[in-house]
């Protein structure tokens, strides 16, 4: 996994191994067959158009084994946590990552995700499919944008910088859950399909969430 540092925010990008990716495709395809479980019409979530299917916690009728997803995400989160431990004075050795929630989103042109944050420690997107963009598309089309708070000395206001991620198939982005983020609409054909997830860091000897990573 590669890391980008924004003092103190850390963003990671990982290439998903092919053997794991094929299992994630299967999970995603099977989930989106359940159009009866589509949450995209719920205005309390960020999705504007398309289809969102909850994988964890899942509807009892979904019947999809997400063990490959859980194993990959928790291993990835541990690597993120190990890297975080090299940049902080906190002792993070007593923590372990636990997948708290996961869902898959499938959207077409003109559809997007509104600005939002997640209630967890770290979150991520695994890119399953990417659209073919129109030649006249904007440079932001279909991209995930993270809003990064950056302090400036003069006149000591807080400004916002951004980090943008294209929907590159077989890649996963990892970021702190408290970062506000959005996904831009686009023009073109095909779908932007992702598996999104949240992880909490808990005490290795219990399921208690110890603290929020800032």
Task: Describe the residue ranges of each PLM region.
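Non-heme Fe(II)/2-oxoglutarate
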Residues: 1-87, 91, 112
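Short beta-strand micro-motifs in enzyme catalytic cores
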Residues: 10, 191-195
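OB-fold ssDNA-binding interfaces and closely related basic DNA-contact patches used
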Residues: 78, 94, 107
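A short coil-to-beta-strand element that immediately follows conserved catalytic motifs
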Residues: 87-101
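Catalytic core of non-heme Fe(II) oxygenases with the double-stranded beta-helix
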Residues: 98-174, 184, 191, 201, ...
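Flexible, surface-exposed loop regions and adjacent strand-edge segments
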Residues: 212-214
């Amino acid at each position: 996994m590669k890391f980008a540092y924004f003092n103190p925010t850390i963003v990671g990008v990982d290439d998903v191994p092919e053997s794991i990716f094929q299992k994630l495709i299967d999970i995603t395809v099977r989930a989106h067959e359940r159009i009866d479980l589509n949450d995209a019409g719920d205005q309390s979530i960020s999705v504007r158009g398309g289809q969102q299917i909850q994988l964890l916690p899942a509807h009892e009728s979904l019947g999809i084994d997400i063990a490959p997803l859980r194993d990959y995400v928790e291993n990835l989160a541990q690597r993120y946590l190990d890297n975080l431990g090299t940049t902080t004075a906190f002792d993070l050795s007593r923590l372990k990552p636990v997948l708290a929630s996961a869902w898959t989103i499938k959207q077409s042109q003109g559809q997007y995700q509104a600005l939002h944050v997640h209630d967890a420690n770290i979150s991520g997107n695994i890119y399953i499919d990417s659209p073919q963009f129109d030649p006249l598309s904007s440079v932001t089309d279909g991209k995930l944008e993270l809003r990064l708070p950056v302090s400036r000395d003069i006149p000591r206001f807080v400004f916002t910088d951004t980090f943008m991620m294209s929907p590159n198939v077989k890649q996963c982005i990892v970021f702190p859950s408290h970062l506000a983020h959005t996904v831009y609409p686009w023009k073109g054909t095909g779908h932007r399909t992702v598996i999104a997830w949240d992880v909490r860091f808990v005490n290795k000897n219990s399921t208690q969430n110890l603290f929020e990573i800032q």
